[in-house]
């Protein structure tokens, strides 16, 4: 169990993780939209859906109403701003061949990995907090919700972009994040 004196330190760490994950997933969503040649609104929507969609799905499944996304708009603002900034950069560059370069796909993979890593921890923490408030559940609920939080936005991004979700195509990634949720639970229980 975490000593009570460390609560604020861990709270700060989780806020930083949420912000880092939000920026990473917003970049991932915006890059997918740019690759699909969407306009500015499409880029912003795909960026916000990717960054905030997993938490929205988690909150709906946990029965949280209104969902966190609608209470604290900071993460929507961060993801929309990040997506718009990326759109502007690519609009200024005006080089359609950039999305076909290796570094572009590598950056997409890296931002996905950062977002997944951050949100699997955040998803587990939020679920544990809800269980402390009286939600019935066990380790499987925590692991499932952590996984949904981590992969939900990316799944929605890929569905909106008319692609098979990456999480279903790369089995090793989904397995590692599922196991990471177990690890987080046992580390703090």
Describe every region a protein language model picked out.
Residues 145-151:
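Generic alpha-helical transmembrane segments
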């Amino acid at each position: 169990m975490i000593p009570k004196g460390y609560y604020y330190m861990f709270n700060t760490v989780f806020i930083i993780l949420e912000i880092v994950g939000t920026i990473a997933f917003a970049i991932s969503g915006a890059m997918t939209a740019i690759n699909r040649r969407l306009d500015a609104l499409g880029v912003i929507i795909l960026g916000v859906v990717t960054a905030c969609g997993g938490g929205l799905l988690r909150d709906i499944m946990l029965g949280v109403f209104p969902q966190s996304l609608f209470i604290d708009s900071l993460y929507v603002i961060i993801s929309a701003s990040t997506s718009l900034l990326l759109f502007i950069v690519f609009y200024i560059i005006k080089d359609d061949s950039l999305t076909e370069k290796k570094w572009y796909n590598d950056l997409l993979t890296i931002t996905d990995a950062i977002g997944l890593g951050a949100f699997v921890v955040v998803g587990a923490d939020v679920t544990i907090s809800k269980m402390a408030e009286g939600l019935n559940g066990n380790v499987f609920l925590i692991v499932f919700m952590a996984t949904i939080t981590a992969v939900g936005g990316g799944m929605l991004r890929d569905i909106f972009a008319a692609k098979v979700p990456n999480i279903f195509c790369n089995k090793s990634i989904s397995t590692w994040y599922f196991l990471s949720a177990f690890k987080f639970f046992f580390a703090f229980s």
